[in-house]
A protein has these predicted regions:
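Condensing-enzyme catalytic core mediating Claisen C-C bond formation in acyl metabolism
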Residues: 66, 90, 100, 131-175
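Active-site-proximal alpha-helical scaffold in enzymes
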Residues: 16-46, 77-111, 151-157
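Short coil/turn connectors at secondary-structure junctions
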Residues: 6-10, 34-40, 96-97, 147-149, ...
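Conserved catalytic cysteine-centered active-site region
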Residues: 1-40, 47-79, 117-143
Length: 177
């Protein structure tokens, strides 16, 4: 930060595998809501495509909790599949309902020229793609990608002072699995 002329600026690095963005957002929100800061900049970056799929898959497998998950043979797709199965059961949803999320996400990617996957897919495409970890199929899962994003989390007064258009956070949760 000193290279930018910013001194005495606290920073925090959060590593939470596939949940790093969500955990970082929540941490920033909690600090602003508690009144510790008026505004917090959350930035996330991932650069992995240069390493190749095999190396990246191996590396990511070390990011889980070895004692509780690794020894049981759990993988991130397996853990996400367990959560997806629980969701399907609790909300009486179908695998086609899950597939509609992938279709929506791909549709959003079509409007972004920098999206990793710019391909229209259908529910049938998702349903007929290879099973990764039931009920998740290939098109339900994200590929390793490079990307970055930032968001400013601030209190309402800061938002009003700096922008006429802002979004209010009306709900936020974090669960432990």
């Amino acid at each position: 930060m000193s290279n930018l002329g910013i001194s005495e600026c606290p920073s925090l690095s959060i590593e939470s595998a596939c949940g790093s963005g969500s955990v970082s957002f929540r941490e920033a929100y909690a600090n602003v809501a508690a009144g510790f800061y008026d505004a917090v900049l959350v930035t996330g970056v991932e650069k992995v495509t240069h390493t190749g799929t095999e190396w990246t898959t191996t590396y990511f497998s070390y990011c889980s909790d070895f004692f509780y998950e690794g020894q049981a043979g759990a993988s991130f797709p397996g853990l996400f599949a367990s959560m997806a199965r629980a969701y399907l059961n609790e909300f009486d949803a179908t695998e086609e309902d899950l597939a509609s999320v992938a279709v929506k996400n791909h549709d959003n990617g079509l409007s972004n020229p920098k999206a990793h996957l710019r391909k229209k897919i259908t529910i049938d495409d998702v349903m007929n793609s290879a099973v990764v970890a039931s009920p998740l199929k290939l098109f339900d899962c994200c590929p390793f990608s490079d990307g970055a994003s930032s968001v400013v989390i601030c209190n309402e007064q800061f938002a009003k002072d700096h922008s006429k258009d802002y979004v209010k956070v009306i709900g936020l949760s974090l669960i432990h699995i």
